[in-house]
Amino acid sequence: MHASLASYAAAAMPALDLRPEIAHAHQPVMSPSHHGWDGNGATAVPTPMPKRLDGKVAIVTGGARGIGEAIVRLFAKHGARVVIADIDDAAGEALASALGPQVSFVRCDVSVEDDVRRAVDWALSRHGGRLDVYCNNAGVLGRQTRAARSILSFDAAEFDRVLRVNALGAALGMKHAARAMAPRRAGSIVSVASVAAVLGGLGPHAYTASKHAIVGLTKNAACELRAHGVRVNCVSPFGVATPMLINAWRQGHDDATADADRDLDLDLDVTVPSDQEVEKMEEVVRGLATLKGPTLRPRDIAEAVLFLASDEARYISGHNLVVDGGVTTSRNLIGL
């Protein structure tokens, strides 16, 4: 197994879901305990579970595709009115249209404070001055040439760009979400970080620094906002096979043909990989995983975000929920 391929697979935040396991937003949520036998020898009739975000208002940045799309769909399925905040107009509007009137789209570049402010204000005006959940999901990986990956030769402008999107974007989201939530003395802010914020050597320097920043911001903001009844948490996922990840690996291992000026971070720029490439990357991820059996998919990360966003986590704040099958616990990443 190639060490660099393994590093990308372990740490990179995915941009697109190639094989979605995402239920439609309007599909009823069924209780697993009500499937099969009812204990009296008869087959029980499935009954809907309570929707965990029923009536709540949520903003999901980077919600047009990938993990963000999985979060949007799951939030809507659980009764939330969801605002997709993304730079991909076509994908965002298409997703909102597909999910119905409870989901809407607003264009938002999270590295621009005016955009973040407008997105929050737009959600408040649309939903009666209410914002219950803000999910900082938008992020970029950064350029993946050999020079860009080295501490000896990285480009300062590119480093700054990645931190502006990933770290500043999360901070601005927390700032304006808290502005809306604090007066109501309630709310949940959930950010998507990475296992690269837990173990060193798993990702590019700018990306790793930005994800550490998200964990630090989460803890600091949780300390400040607890007095206002606002919870702040983050989720750090393991690798998921996505076009962004696969394209980054291609660029990083073909410096002879790589265009150092090409952005491979944004969903709009990636080339959809073949099924064989997806299977290869998923094989790499499964090989690195210490929990054998399931393959981590965007839906798994969305479920973790849903938990932290919901009242089921009402006394959890300042926490980094690592979704990695125990990799960072055992630190058993052979080949990295």
Curated annotation (Swiss-Prot):
Keyword match Oxidoreductase: yes
**CDD domains, from UniProt?**
secoisolariciresinol-DH_like_SDR_c
Q: Which residues form the active site?
A: 207
Which InterPro entries does the UniProt entry name for this protein?
ABA2-like, NAD(P)-bd_dom_sf, SDR_fam
Q: Which GO terms describe its molecular function?
A: oxidoreductase activity, acting on the CH-OH group of donors, NAD or NADP as acceptor
Keyword annotations for this protein, in alphabetical order, are:
Developmental protein, Oxidoreductase
Residues involved in substrate binding: 194
Q: Which domain of life is it from?
A: Eukaryota
Detail which positions bind NAD(+).
59-83
Family from the record: Belongs to the short-chain dehydrogenases/reductases (SDR) family.
Enumerate the PANTHER family for this protein.
Answer: 3-OXOACYL-(ACYL-CARRIER-PROTEIN) REDUCTASE (AFU_ORTHOLOGUE AFUA_6G11210), SEX DETERMINATION PROTEIN TASSELSEED-2
What protein name is recorded for this chain? Sex determination protein tasselseed-2
Q: Origin organism of this chain?
A: Zea mays
Q: Which gene encodes it?
A: TS2
